[in-house]
């Protein structure tokens, strides 16, 4: 649904209104998991819908026993098959975890997934003053549209796997959501990093990129502002534009880089235009699509969080038209017009492929999917 005064809501044929589908159900699932978090979606060229979620076996806590599950549909969402895509390393039955997936589809069709891995209690960015000993970033890949997955590859044990990591790194992980392949074939994954600076830990948004189909990566530099973290990027005319969580600011920040993440500056058309309430910010999604008239648009999902703190209510989708910035940032719809669960909620992920638009989002311990293609059709009629 959308705000009743929203142009897109007024023009939507009620018979085409998207209906939510519970993909990962905390009350009915094959793992007896009590909670699901961190949704991720990729729409594939052959029509396959591939989604992911943290299996939070014992509840919403970040510092717990967690694996990453996949849900896969080859019949446009009518039926789904479930699997564990990445398992934690089973060192500690309370705290071993892989979590917060970030995915990308390369030009070869390979699907790459990276996730953070830990084995002890404590916040990934703030618990230690030196590089955390139980931390790693793990990568897996699939060459059969998500049917099977490779063994885990440790990107942090061998420094040659990810070049240009700062010496004052506490830890890093993916930006949570999806990456892109640039027009020249470079794979770009959003990332977030914790650094030790002036006797305190600060966290920032950045990217990693690969020019060899994910075999090795190079880390870009941090954005100008700390308290940024989970982000996604799109390519526009060879530049990277980032939309990112920005804690305690009350809005989503936006940056642009013309040198593959070496330097970043504020991207004014999007920076501060999407409000996210008081207190902690929240993850969001940011993808690019093209309309029928050839306009390049950005689609952003994020909670409005009108009640502040961790309620993260009203997960909404917004649009910016890069070829007509005079329109500003427009609200498209609110797929989840409810309060989030303050113990864990508000996250979402968008995907666009072959004129189809989909979203997955957190819904009080479940992960729901909606086909938002009817709204994309309305965008085309603007």
Swiss-Prot record:
It catalyses: Hydrolysis of alpha-(2->3)-, alpha-(2->6)-, alpha-(2->8)- glycosidic linkages of terminal sialic acid residues in oligosaccharides, glycoproteins, glycolipids, colominic acid and synthetic substrates. Keywords: Glycosidase, Hydrolase, Repeat, Secreted. InterPro entries: Sialidase, Sialidase_fam, Sialidase_sf, Sialidase_trypan. It is found in: Secreted. It comes from the Bacteria. One of its GO terms (molecular function) is exo-alpha-sialidase activity. The active site is at 62 (proton acceptor), 347 (nucleophile). One of its GO terms (cellular component) is membrane. Substrate binds at residues 37, 245. GO terms for biological process: ganglioside catabolic process; oligosaccharide catabolic process. Its main location: secreted. Sialidases have been suggested to be pathogenic factors in microbial infections. PANTHER family: EXO-ALPHA-SIALIDASE (PTHR10628:SF30), SIALIDASE (PTHR10628). Belongs to the glycosyl hydrolase 33 family. This is Sialidase.
């Amino acid at each position: 649904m959308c705000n009743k005064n929203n142009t897109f809501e007024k023009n939507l044929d009620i018979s085409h209104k998207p209906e939510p589908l519970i993909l990962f159900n905390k009350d009915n699932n094959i793992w007896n998991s009590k909670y699901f978090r961190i949704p991720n979606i990729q729409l594939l060229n052959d029509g396959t819908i591939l989604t992911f979620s943290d299996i939070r076996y014992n509840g919403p806590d970040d510092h717990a026993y967690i694996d990453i599950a996949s849900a896969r549909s080859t019949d446009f969402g009518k039926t789904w098959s479930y699997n564990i895509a990445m398992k934690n390393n089973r060192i500690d039955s309370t705290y071993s975890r892989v979590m917060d997936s970030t995915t990308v589809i390369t030009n070869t069709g390979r699907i790459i997934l990276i996730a953070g891995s830990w084995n002890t209690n404590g916040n990934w960015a703030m618990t230690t003053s030196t590089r955390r000993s139980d931390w790693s970033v793990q990568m897996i890949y699939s060459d059969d549209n998500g049917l099977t997955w490779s063994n885990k590859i440790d990107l942090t044990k061998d420094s040659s796997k990810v070049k240009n990591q700062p010496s004052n790194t506490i830890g890093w992980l993916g930006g949570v959501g999806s990456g892109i392949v640039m027009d020249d074939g470079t794979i770009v994954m959003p990332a977030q990093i914790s650094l030790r600076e002036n006797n305190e830990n600060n966290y920032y948004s950045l990217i990693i990129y690969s020019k060899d189909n994910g075999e090795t990566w190079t880390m870009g530099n941090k954005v100008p502002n700390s308290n940024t973290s989970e982000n996604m990027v799109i390519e526009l005319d060879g530049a990277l534009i980032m939309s990112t969580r920005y804690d305690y600011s009350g809005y989503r920040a936006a940056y642009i880089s013309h040198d593959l993440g070496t330097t970043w500056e504020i991207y004014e058309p999007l920076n501060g235009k999407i409000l996210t309430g008081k207190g902690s910010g929240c993850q969001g999604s940011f993808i690019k699509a093209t309309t029928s008239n050839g306009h390049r648009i950005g689609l952003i999902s994020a909670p409005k969080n009108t009640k502040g703190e961790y309620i993260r209510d009203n997960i909404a989708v917004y649009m910016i038209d890069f070829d007509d910035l005079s329109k500003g940032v427009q609200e498209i719809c609110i797929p989840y017009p409810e309060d989030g669960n303050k113990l864990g909620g508000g996250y979402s992920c968008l995907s666009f492929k072959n004129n189809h638009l989909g979203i997955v989002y957190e819904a009080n311990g479940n992960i729901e999917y909606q086909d938002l293609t009817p709204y994309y059709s309305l965008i085309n009629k603007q």
